[in-house]
From Swiss-Prot:
Annotated membrane topology: Multi-pass membrane protein
Listed name of the protein: Cytochrome b-245 light chain
Placement of covalent cross-link Glycyl lysine isopeptide (Lys-Gly) (interchain with G-Cter in ubiquitin): K149
Gene source species: Oryctolagus cuniculus (Rabbit)
Quaternary state and interactors: Component of the phagocyte NADPH oxidase core complex/cytochrome b558 complex, composed of CYBB (heavy chain (beta)) and CYBA (light chain (alpha)). Component of the phagocyte NADPH oxidase complex composed of an obligatory core heterodimer formed by the membrane proteins CYBA and CYBB and the cytosolic regulatory subunits NCF1/p47-phox, NCF2/p67-phox, NCF4/p40-phox and the small GTPase RAC1 or RAC2. Interacts with NCF1 (via SH3 domain). Interacts with SH3PXD2A. Interacts with DUOX1, DUOX2 and TPO. Interacts with NOX4; this interaction mediates superoxide generation.
Signal peptide (from-to): none
Length: 194
């Protein structure tokens, strides 16, 4: 049985919590809640979390599906160096970003989700995981001569000679009448109206 890669789960949880923070911040700011400035903070924090978490890290074993447009943000995260690779840093950052958003009811759900993502990142860091970017692999082109080992030795199955139609037989009319022509109705039709 394989080992669970916790960073993958933390990444999905943090990305979802960033989106939830943005949505709650929009509700709080547009609704002019009494502490609406926490809503604007939640929007900024949610956008930051989404930008940080959008690029997926590559898995230790197997292949990883890259998100659409991820390579551009991956280049930015590579520039941050060890700050973007270290999951201890991400856990602390997410925990610190979640505290001010917890003072407003509209953003409390995003706060709880971000705290859960922080805990999962801490678990991933304790287990020794770190973020590694998905590197594009060069596509291997199959060589035409290399894919075919031997041509087939048996011909494909064909119907018996008697069952095969010859080109001239299609024009000839069989005894029962042409297949595409008019047909004779076996039931007599009368045109009497009562």
């Amino acid at each position: 049985m394989g080992q669970i890669e916790w960073a993958m789960w933390a990444n999905e949880q943090a990305l979802a919590s960033g989106l939830i923070l943005v949505a709650g911040g929009i509700v709080a700011t547009a609704g002019r809640f009494t502490q609406w400035y926490f809503g604007t903070y939640a929007i900024a924090a949610g956008v930051l979390v989404c930008l940080l978490e959008y690029p997926r890290g590559s898995r230790a074993k197997g292949s990883t599906l890259e998100r659409c447009g991820q390579r551009y943000l991956t280049a930015v995260l590579k520039l941050l160096g060890p700050l973007s690779r270290n999951y201890y840093f991400r856990a602390a950052l997410h925990l610190a970003l979640s505290v001010p958003a917890g003072f407003l009811l509209a953003t409390i759900l995003g706060t709880v989700c971000l705290v859960i993502a922080s805990i999962i990142y801490l678990l991933a860091a304790v287990r020794g995981e770190q973020w590694t970017p998905i590197e594009p692999r060069p596509k291997e082109r199959p060589q035409v001569g290399g894919t075919i080992k031997q041509p087939p030795s048996n011909p494909p199955p064909r119907p018996p000679v008697e069952a095969r139609k010859k080109p001239g037989e299609e024009d000839a009319t069989p005894a029962g009448g042409p297949p595409g022509g008019p047909r004779v109705n076996p039931i007599p039709v009368t045109d009497e109206v009562v």
